[in-house]
Every structure is written in structure tokens, then in C-alpha cells.
Amino acid sequence: RDPEMSRGLGDVYKRQAIIDAKRAGEIPSAELALVVASNASAYALTRAENAGIAHTVLRKEKGEAPENYGERLLALLRENAIDVVVLAGFLTILPENVIRAYDHRILNIHPSLIPSFCGDGFYGLHVHEAALKRGVKVTGATVHFVNEITDGGDIIAQKAVEVLPGDTPETLQRRVMEQAEWILLPQALEQVAGEIAKKREEKQ
């Protein structure tokens, strides 16, 4: 079971890419069980409603300790028997207790070929602006596990995308989404979910 966690235009399409891939039979090892948004106005909730996926909002209260928020999130994940978490623009930083509890079971996608253009400050259009400024000829996307270091977890999969003459951050962002992110994320989810299912079968 896999919860998707929520934001932004690109993130909306990432979630839809997962939903579409599941409908097409491309993610047989995972059930899309829950969408958790940190913002009640997140369009992820509408997407989930339209797809018949359970969804909820879990806000971090003002002044709430990260560990306490993490315990509330963990309780929600355990209540829904969640095995794998896919981050898609979830606005609240994941507390360390959640990362520890779901070690190598939280997936994130980053719009560059890590280790290039990643880490603190590299998000959204900033990534593509940096790639164009550096003059790279190839960029892409990376799906990786989440750990305590921003974009620092083990790499699951990468896909390269050509940078074209005349590209702007916006055109490059769109190409990376269409040619890499929307393809790579469902594939990585199936890979990880399949490995979890296989290990579970071997224990039986």
C-alpha cells in the first residue's frame, strides 16, 4: 500500500502519472491507498477524490514539535497499513522519526541528475535555472530514497533529458517532467513495491 503525499502544477501531474500508470496496469505491486495533504486546498485531494483514493489532511500545528507531528503522521500511515510513501510536493518537512520508521520506503523525485543541482535551495525552477546557467547539455530526473539529508538518499533510478538550444527554465522544466519525471516515478514505485512484496512472500 502506498500513500502519496501532496503541491504545485508539476506535482499535480506527478500524482496523475502514478494514478494513470496504476490504471494502465503498470504498477501491479502497489495499491494507491491514501493521499495525505498538508494543506486543505491542495489539488491532490481533488485528484484523489476523482480516482476513488482515500485522502486526508494532516496539518502541522503552529509551534508543534516535529517529533509530535511525526507521531501523528506515523499513526495515520500505520492505521492505513502503508508500506511505501511517495512524496509529491508535501509541504511539511518530514520529521526524522518518520524517516527512520520508513527507512528505504520513502520515495522522492528530483528534477536533475543527482548529484548535480540538488540539495538545499534546489527546487522547482531553481534547478533548471542552475542547469542552464552552468551550460550543461544533458539534465534529467532522479528518484531516490529520502533520508535526513536533502536529496541525499540512495538513488533508485535516473533518466536523462537533452537540453536544447534556446531552452528557458520553463521549457526545460516541462521537458524534464514529460520525458523523465512522469515516466520514472511510476517505474520506481513498482520496483520498490515489488521488492517489498517479494521479501514478504519469502518470509511466509
Predicted regions and their residues:
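Charged helix-capping and loop-helix junction motifs
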Residues: N68-L74, Y123-V127
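Donor/substrate-binding cores of folate-linked one-carbon enzymes
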Residues: V84, A88-A197
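Short, structured coil segments at secondary-structure junctions
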Residues: G8, A51-G52, Y102
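Short, surface-exposed acidic-centric catalytic microdomains
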Residues: P28-N68
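Single conserved hydrophobic/aromatic residue that forms the stacking wall/gate
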Residues: R1-L9, Y13
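Short, well-ordered alpha-helical microsegments
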Residues: R15, A44, I93-E96
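Glycine-rich phosphate-binding loop signature in dinucleotide/nucleotide-binding domains
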Residues: L76-D83
